[in-house]
Amino acid sequence: MQTVMMDDIQSTDSIAEKDNHSNNESNFTWKAFREQVEKHFSKIERLHQVLGTDGDNSSLFELFTTAMNAQLHEMEQCQKKLEDDCQQRIDSIRFLVSSLKLTDDTSSLKIESPLIQCLNRLSMVEGQYMAQYDQKLSTIKEMYHKLESYCNRLGSPFVLPDFENSFLSDVSDAFTESLRGRINEAEKEIDARLEVINSFEEEILGLWSELGVEPADVPQYEQLLESHTNRPNDVYVTQELIDQLCKQKEVFSAEKEKRSDHLKSIQSEVSNLWNKLQVSPNEQSQFGDSSNINQENISLWETELEKLHQLKKEHLPIFLEDCRQQILQLWDSLFYSEEQRKSFTPMYEDIITEQVLTAHENYIKQLEAEVSANKSFLSLINRYASLIEGKKELEASSNDASRLTQRGRRDPGLLLREEKIRKRLSRELPKVQSLLIPEITAWEERNGRTFLFYDEPLLKICQEATQPKSLYRSASAAANRPKTATTTDSVNRTPSQRGRVAVPSTPSVRSASRAMTSPRTPLPRVKNTQNPSRSISAEPPSATSTANRRHPTANRIDINARLNSASRSRSANMIRQGANGSDSNMSSSPVSGNSNTPFNKFPNSVSRNTHFESKSPHPNYSRTPHETYSKASSKNVPLSPPKQRVVNEHALNIMSEKLQRTNLKEQTPEMDIENSSQNLPFSPMKISPIRASPVKTIPSSPSPTTNIFSAPLNNITNCTPMEDEWGEEGF
């Protein structure tokens, strides 16, 4: 036991020596205590030997341990308290630095030994920061109390900042400036509300004066007047006070407006009665003030109105005639029909009574209410009516053939005005008609009757005008027509293709293995010196230059030579008339000559008689031994269009009859003209050579169809070379 005790003492001694070696090198108290303890232990051991006891010193060691533990605990508590105080000072310093928004570094603040000196040093630093904090906090509190008084005067909408959460944790210069800004804002709000209150009070006092209100009639008159003249500095300017004054102002303003309207209605009625009764202006000017709205002035006007009503009963015919004139004007503005006008029977009665006049006046009010309710709709109707009137004037002026040739003083701006009216109609009339359709529909649904425009339903007129007109024959009409050698699809043509004429052609025999290729670019035009009539060779033009022209051979024939000259000339002239016509609405039609062979399609070229320029190349047709090409031509075909214009439909009928007289029994495949305006090139005769539908091929072996061409051409031996539009030689 003694050995363990000594070991504990030695271990404690070693720990103490390690902890206090640097600070207590000159302190020998613990060594002296240890020496005394060792002496005591040596004496105790000798006494145990002398006494012969077992050497039990447990009670002594227990007392010694208890004393040491008590001392150790006391010192540990003291250390902990000093450390807590130091940490509290550090936290306080950091809070003050944060509240002051300083840039000082507080991370170096630590608890160091010795603790008493560390605590003293931290307390000194805390005092320095606390002085700055207290100074700024006192300034902020003064500003806060001032702001609090302002907020009390302004009322609940103007809320104070939170005292605990706002500036106690922030006493920086930025927060001070923000608080000062709030004070300035409150002062401005007080001034603004004072101005509003003063304005309301002045207006209320003015309204009382205009309405003739006496102080005895209004309980708060004296209080309001005293507040307006002698207002204290700390008066409350809450929003409730402003709302109360605003309500009072609205009440008296409504009373003023009511009296003003009543007075104006009386004055208007009195003025109308004065004019109808022919009261002299001097008597009118001598009457009371027209702008005063007090009760006395209104009573004077009411008395005058009663007198005039008595005179009105004595002059009913004058008033009845005036009412009927007003009704006629309202009828015109509402575009009433005759049936609607006749529905008001008092208009056509000869009885003149006060009840009839009252019925007229009530009907006028009804019509005026209808005009007011349909103001926007009627303005659109008037716009449409003005356009229709301009259209009628334009038609009347255009139908007058002598407007430009009449003698005497002429109108040089007539054509310019007509053109302006025409442009205005084309620009605005469709737009107005499209806008009228939903408006008229809604009007008819509201009123339960049809809106008539000069006894005609305007909705039907607008719907018919806005629907696209069919400029061409419908598909059903085309299906019911008897089939001829060729058919032309002109329904879907563009306006630029309406003047083109489609020429029927014989079915070309095309190789099944070779499809139609894209058109080739035509060669430059070369004057045809051999034949003045433009014919088409039996073969399409080649891609070579004009230097490599083809030479005539025995097996190439000129089909045009076999045609009747007279029939060729007539058909060519009709084709030229249809092609060179200036009517853009002409539809394409098939053309045929008076011969045994129907015309083939013309190759693409540039016409001399049109202002169009073909940009499409010449189509490249595949040839077979039995394929022939022909063109309606004559020896003396004029290059300029004839003076007489042939209508396309008329030419269609004539040439269809000629085609039937040829007794062609073969089944000619139907042709469709290409619908696309971009893929449809121009030809000299305004004929499109491009097919839209697949072309039926004719077999190369002899057939009843090919016999038509081979029968009359067996003994032809002399063939003359010809040139087409591109300078290519043909036969």
From Swiss-Prot:
Residues 483-497, 505-520, 527-547, 597-609 have a biased composition (Polar residues). Coiled coil: none annotated. The keyword Membrane does not apply. One of its GO terms (cellular component) is mitotic spindle midzone. Keywords: Cell cycle, Cell division, Cytoplasm, Cytoskeleton, Microtubule, Mitosis, Phosphoprotein. The modification Phosphoserine is found at S537. Residues 472-642 are annotated as: Disordered. Residues 560-596 have a biased composition (Low complexity). One of its GO terms (biological process) is horsetail-astral microtubule organization. Its main location: cytoplasm. GO terms for molecular function: microtubule binding; microtubule lateral binding. The keyword Cell cycle applies. SUPFAM superfamilies: Spectrin repeat. InterPro entries: MAP65_Ase1_PRC1 (IPR007145). It is found in: Cytoplasm, Cytoskeleton; Cytoplasm, Cytoskeleton, Spindle. It comes from the Eukaryota. Belongs to the MAP65/ASE1 family. Interacts with klp9. Required for anaphase spindle elongation and microtubule bundling in both interphase and mitosis. Has a role in spatial and temporal regulation of septation and cytokinesis and ensures equal partition of segregating sister chromatids. Ensures correct midzone positioning of protein kinase ark1. Acts as a regulatory component at cytokinesis checkpoint where it inhibits nuclear division when actomyosin ring formation is impaired. This is Anaphase spindle elongation protein 1. It comes from Schizosaccharomyces pombe (strain 972 / ATCC 24843) (Fission yeast). The gene is ase1.
